[in-house]
Amino acid sequence: MAIDPEEFKKRRQERQLQRQKQQRSMMIKLAVAGAVLVLCAILIVVLVVAGNRKQQPAPEQTQASQTQQQATQTGQTQTPETENATQEKQSVETVIHLAAAGDLNITEKVVNAGGGELSYTDTFMDVAHILAGADVTMLNLEGNLSGPPYGTDRSAPQTMMDALSAAGVDLIQLANSYSIYKGMDGLNQTVNNIRLAGMEPVGVRTAEELKTKKPYTICNVQGVKIAFVSFTKGMDGMALPPGNEGCVNVLYADYSTDYQTVDTEGITAVLEAVEKEKPDITVALLHWGSEYNNTVSASQEKISALMQELGVDAVIGTHSHYVQKMQFDPEAGTFVAYSLGDFLGDAQRSGSEYSVILDLEITKNNETGKTRITGYSYTPIFTVAEEEKPLRVVRIPEAMKAFEEGYIDRISQQSYDAMAYALERIKARTEAE
C-alpha cells in the first residue's frame, strides 16, 4: 500500500510533539537534580572559604583566549558565493536518511522493562533522537499485539508500540517467525494495533486486505519514492491456512519445513509489481539465516543476488540476533546488511546484547531523477541488563563516556567492560568477508 505523503508528515509531526513533551518532563527532572547538586557545591565552597581566607591569585586567561579563538575559527561567515553554491547543490540534490534497527524480541523480561504501568518511554529514551532523526525509521517486531498475558505468549502491550511510535519508528516489519504465532486472528489484531499506534506494518496483509492492499509499502519522502518489501524464511514451522497464502511474504517454497527451495517465482512476482510503481529506491527487509549463528548461507547470498537483479537497492536482514557483515557497493549504489542483531531482547545469550541502528544515506539528483544509496553508518547500541534495574537500550560510546566521567545513574563496571568488548565485535562482524 502507499502511505499518503501528507499523512506520513502528519504522523511524524504528532510524534515530534509527543517527544517534546517527554523531553520537557525529563528536563524538569534534570533541573531539579541539578539544583540539588548546585546547592551542595555552594555549601562546600562556603565551608572551604571559611576555613581558608587567603586570597588566591587570579587565574590566567589562556583557556578563555583559546576558547574565543576556536569560536572565531568555527564561526566564520559564508561569502555570498559559497552560500549560492550550497543552495544550488541543495536544489539539484535531495538527500534523505533511512534508519533501521534489528529485532524487538518480545519476552516476559522485555515486557517487564515497562514496570507496573507498562511504560516504555525510558526504555528507548537514549536512542529516540536517532530513530526520530531519520526520514523513515523501521524495525522488526518478533511478537504480536494480541492482548494479555504479555510476554509469555510473545504478546506486547499497546503501550510499547505507542512508545516506539513516539520515539520515531514509522514501519514495523511483521514478516518473521511470529507472524501467525497466535493464528490469523492474532495477525489481524497485530496489524490493526500497529496502525493504531501510528505506524505501518510491512510484509503482511490480513485476509480481508488480500484484494485491496499490495504486498509492499510505498513512502514518498521529500520527493523520493521508496518501496519497502519484507519477506520471512518461515513462521516457526507453521503454515498459512488455505486461502491465506498471500498474507505473509515468504522466501522459501518449503517455508514451513526445510527452507531448501527458494521461492523464486513468488519473490519475482512481488518485486516485479514493485518495479511497476517506478520507485526511486527499493528496500527489502528480510527475516532469514539461522539464529545465534554468524554464518551467512549460500541460500542467503542467492536470495540477495536475486533481489538485486530484480531492482532491490538495499537488503536489511534480521533473525540471527547477532550483528553480521555489511556490504556496500558505491558504484552500483547497493547495500546489504545480513543482520542488525537484537534491538531489544533478554540479552541473556552472549552476542545478542549488542547491535546497531543503521543509517542509510540516499541521494536523488532532481535534474536526472537518478537515485542511489550514497553512504551508510551505524550507531552501536547495547541492552543494559543490570540487577534491580529494568532493561534499557543505550548508545555504547555515550554510555561508556558517562561511566568514565562519573555521571549519575551511569552503567556498572561490568556493563562498561561488556560494551568495550562489544565495540570490537561489532567492528569485526560488520567488516567480515
Residue ranges and their predicted role:
Residues 2-15, 27-55, 73-433:
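Acidic, metal/ion-coordinating pockets
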Residues 20-27:
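Intrinsically disordered, low-complexity Ser/Pro-rich, charge-biased
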Residues 52-64:
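Ser/Thr/Pro/Gly-rich low-complexity linker/stalk segments immediately outside membranes or between
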Residues 61, 65-73:
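Intrinsically disordered, low-complexity, repeat-rich polar/charged segments
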